[in-house]
Amino acid sequence: LINGIELNESEEDLKERLQVSKDCRDLNEYLEKFEFPLTLLQKAEAITECVRMLIAGQDSQGIMYSEIRFAPQLHMQKGLTQEEVVKAAIKGLDNSDYHKLILCCMRGSDNEELNKETIRLAHKYLGRGVVALDLAGAEKLYPTKQFVGIFKEALAYNIPFTIHAGEADGEESIRTAIYMGAERIGHGIRAAWSEDMIKELA
């Protein structure tokens, strides 16, 4: 029983629910695997414990520094507010100097206000466990250019941000992310298809 949810699956069944197959077709199919673990992370206590367990695992592997990224808006299914989610995750950091949080805005068609709230929370908790923002999700369905406007607010707040770009979409997505002010690019594998883009990123 985890977070009020009974898990009767075998280890192999759990792996099937959490891992994509070798013939995974695209990013959207990959992202579907987030749905199950998210059901277990809808209470503050579960979020705090998850962060602590993740950090303990990293420490045991000798990882010196990490930035744990997650989307607060995806943890509201049982009544938590985004701020309660962020506070729970910060609590799990236990004031660590070596493990921090990146708050993700999500690509979508009806969540602009949620994304704006994420940006405001990143501003509020910047330097208090939060170090940056991100934009994640289904890049092909919701192109990077659709989010230029809301990230102007992040720039106004001087919040550093990274953007997942150039994974499911082409190099133009990376170019847009750079134009938006991204300091880092998540994945960005399509850059390898363009010598000009490689030079621009160098």
Regions found by a protein language model. Give the residues of each.
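Metal-cofactor-binding active-site regions of metalloenzymes
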Residues: 1-159, 168-173, 179, 183-184, ...
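Active-site metal-binding loops of divalent metal-dependent hydrolases
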Residues: 165
